Each structure stands twice: as C-alpha cells, then as structure tokens.
Swiss-Prot record:
This is Leucine-rich repeat extensin-like protein 7. The gene is LRX7. It comes from Arabidopsis thaliana. Pfam families: LRR_1, LRR_8. Modulates cell morphogenesis by regulating cell wall formation and assembly, and/or growth polarization. Residues 1-21 form the signal peptide.
Length: 433
C-alpha cells in the first residue's frame, strides 16, 4: 500500500468547524483533526502520475467533508478520477498526450466541510467552482501551487478570516468571486495591482478604507457592496475608464464627495453608490458617461441640482436618486424608463422632505476638501451641509439607515446588488498562454 506524502504539502490538519456548517443556528464547537496521510491501495492503477496526485487531493477533500446531502461525491472512489462527479479532465497544456484534471465544479452542492491543503496537488486545474455550499475555514496555502487557476468561485459559503492573500500570487487568475462569506479586515493593495477581469467581494465583513490604488485594477466588473468600507471613493478609480463596465459600491459607509473623475468612466453601464454617506453635488462630468444605463445614488446626503447632461444621456434608462437632499432636477429625468425622485427637497413636488428638514440641512455648506481624499477629489459645492467624517456616524451594519435629519424609512430588505452570474459551470477557461 502506497503512502502519498509529498514534501510540498503539510497533511496535518486541524480545522475548527462550526455546527452551523451542518445545521443553521449552531455555535462553533466542532473540532476536526486529521494527521494521517492518504494511502493509495496497491490494486489501483492510474493512467499517469498527475491523475494519481489528483486522486490523493480528491480523497483528502472527501475526508474533509462532513455533510454531502445530495450525495455528489458518492462515486469519488477508484482510480478513474475523471469520472468523479464535478471533476473535469482534459489534455494537459504542456503535453496533449497526458490527461489531467482541469477543473472542479461542485456548485450548489450544499456540502459542508473545509478545503484541505492537498488540493494544492491539482496543479493543472483552471476552474475551481464551489459556490452555494457550506465550506468554512480559510483558503489553504496549498492553493499557491495552482499556477494555472483561471476562475476561482468560493461564493455563498462560510469561509472566514482575513482576505485570502494566497490568491494574489496566482499568475493566471482572472475571475475571483468571494461574495457572501465571512471574510473580514482590510483589503491588500496588491489585489488592485493584479490583472483580474472580474472581482466580487460583496456581502462579507471587510472593514477598512478602499485602497487608494483601486484605479490600477483592469477589471471590467467590480462589486464591493454590502461590506463596511468607509472613507473616500478613491480618486484613482478614474483610471479604470478603459476597462470598467460595472462598479457596485452600495451599502457601505463611504463618506466623501463624488470625485470629478467619475466622468472618465465612459464605458461604465452600471454604477451603484447608493446606501452610503456621500455628500455634495453630482459632478457635471457624469454627463460624459455615454454608456451609462443604470445609475443609483439613493440613500446618501447628496444635494444641489442634478446636472441636465446626466438625464440626457442617450442610454440611461434607470436613475434612482431618492432619499437625498437634491433641490432641482431637469425635466428629462421624468422621461426615463425607471426613476425615483422621492424624499428630496424639490419645491411643489409630492413625497418630499419637509421644508424645515431641508432648510436645516442645506443651511450648512459642504467642504469637499475636509475629507482629505486627495488632489482631484473635489466636487461642485452647493450650499448643503458641513458634515465631516468625524461628526457623521458610519453605517454600522450592511443595511445603512437613512441620513440624519430625515424621517427614518420603514424597515426594508437589503437592496439588490447588480452583478452578473458566475461563469457557466464546467466551461473551459480561455487560453492560459
């Protein structure tokens, strides 16, 4: 009987699992410990050594699963690993005569457990999709061996801890989806220097300022919604104009004016900065966002006049600007397919704030420089309120309350997050060259 114990991987594993990984509402008290190596029965014959390594990785992973309600891994035995449910095989990139495991897709399996270090033996995989399960713990260091990994989807699980920086070193990674987990702390600046195409971090517990180098990222889709980010919208994001198509920053604690460089995002089709604490006017430069289709700035403390150029954008069809302190809107806004103008300070218009509330708020000027975001982070200052980050409370939870001085709205579910679906399951990644 062969014992597989490669030197690059540590097989001793101690992982604290949560009872909630098995049933909702439990407390963390289940300790899973394993220090025995994976053994390969002598009667198993493998087509090549890479498939043998894949067998070890998958058997270790199966051991790390404590619940598989749909029995997806019941056929995970024997040497024919390419026949395992959720396992994709193809020709090796460096040798077309060698078959290897090129992807794993266990999406929507409701499997509970953790990811073992041995998964680092799957050195040929391009796709790793495990969304909508109950995996917990952290991303193992062994993932640093996955030099061909192109798509990593860990969304809708119970992973926790700091941002898994092991992904920063994956040279081929283009698609990273960590949404709907329990990751926390700060985002590393190096994340935005990485050559990603899509980045989904929404609905976690990240709490920090957004790194100032966010604009270095070449992503086409960036979703940071429903976390606890605070401070400024980094002015550097104007540099993303050539690549960015969708940006979702809603439901955080951002406090600043909107940078004038917003107008440089001329390829953006969806922009959502609702449910924050943004102040000042909408920059007139936003009238240059010629591809904009959906714009949501609801539930902030914005004021002044809505630029004529904005509602005249040819492709704009959905503009939500309710629950702010705007004092004027062009008539063209009311001709859009979808719009929301309520709870502002428009005169002689129904469903607005009271005159007293508007007067109190608008009597204090906004000083965009007080936020000290950086040069270029100015906005056109109307007469609205002087609100500094130190005096204005941060949104304490993923669903911020309405701004101060306003009548609190009735309780409502968290707002939707515009984001495209994950990549098609079992799809082959683009060229790894």
């Amino acid at each position: 009987m062969r014992i597989y114990q490669p030197t690059l991987l540590i097989f001793t594993t101690v992982v604290l699992l949560s009872i909630s990984a098995v049933a909702p509402g439990g407390s963390r008290q289940l300790l899973y410990t394993r220090d025995d190596p994976i053994t390969i029965p002598p009667y198993l014959i493998f087509e090549n050594v890479r498939l043998e390594r894949a067998y070890v990785a998958l058997q270790a992973w199966k051991r790390a699963m404590i619940s598989d309600p749909w029995n997806l891994t019941t056929n995970w035995f024997g040497s024919r690993v390419c026949d395992y449910n959720g396992v994709v095989c193809s020709e090796s990139l460096d040798d077309p005569l060698v078959k290897t495991v090129s992807g794993v897709d266990l999406n929507q399996g409701d499997i509970a457990g953790h990811l073992p270090e041995e998964l680092g033996l799957l050195t040929d995989i391009a796709l790793f999709h495990v969304n909508s399960n109950r995996f917990c713990g952290t991303l193992p260091v062994g993932f640093s061996q996955l030099s061909l990994l192109f798509e990593l989807d860990l969304s809708n699980n119970r992973f926790a801890g700091k941002f898994p920086e092991v992904v920063i070193g994956l040279p081929k990674l283009k698609y990273l989806d960590l949404r709907y987990n329990e990751f926390e702390g700060e985002l590393p600046e190096s994340l935005f220097d990485k050559d990603l195409d899509a980045l989904f971090l929404n609905s976690n517990r990240f709490r920090s300022k957004i790194p100032v180098n966010m604009g270095n990222s070449p992503v086409s889709v960036l979703v940071l919604a429903s976390n606890r980010f605070e401070g400024c919208i980094p002015p550097s994001f104007g540099k993303m104009g050539k690549t960015l198509n969708e940006i979702i920053l809603m439901d955080n604690g951002l406090q600043s004016c909107i940078p004038n460089d917003m107008g440089l995002l001329q390829n953006v089709t969806v922009l959502d900065i609702s449910y924050n604490w943004l102040v000042g006017e909408l920059p007139k430069s936003m009238g240059q966002m010629e591809n904009l289709e959906v714009l949501n700035v609801e539930r902030n403390m914005l004021s002044g006049l809505i630029p004529d150029e904005l509602c005249s954008l040819e492709k704009l069809r959905d503009f939500r600007y309710g629950s702010n302190y705007f004092t004027g809107e062009p008539a063209t806004c009311r001709y859009l397919e979808n719009y929301n103008y309520t709870m502002n300070c428009f005169k002689d218009v129904r469903d607005q704030r009271s005159m007293m509330e508007c007067k109190m708020f608008l009597s204090k000027p906004v000083d965009c420089d007080s936020f000290k975001c950086s040069p270029g982070s100015s906005c056109f200052s109307p007469p609205p309120s002087q609100i500094s980050p130190s005096s204005q409370p941060l949104a304490p939870a993923p669903s911020p309350t309405s701004p101060p001085l306003s009548t609190p709205p009735p309780a409502r579910p968290c707002p939707p997050v515009y984001s495209p679906p994950p990549p098609p399951p079992l799809s082959l990644a683009p060229s790894m060259n």
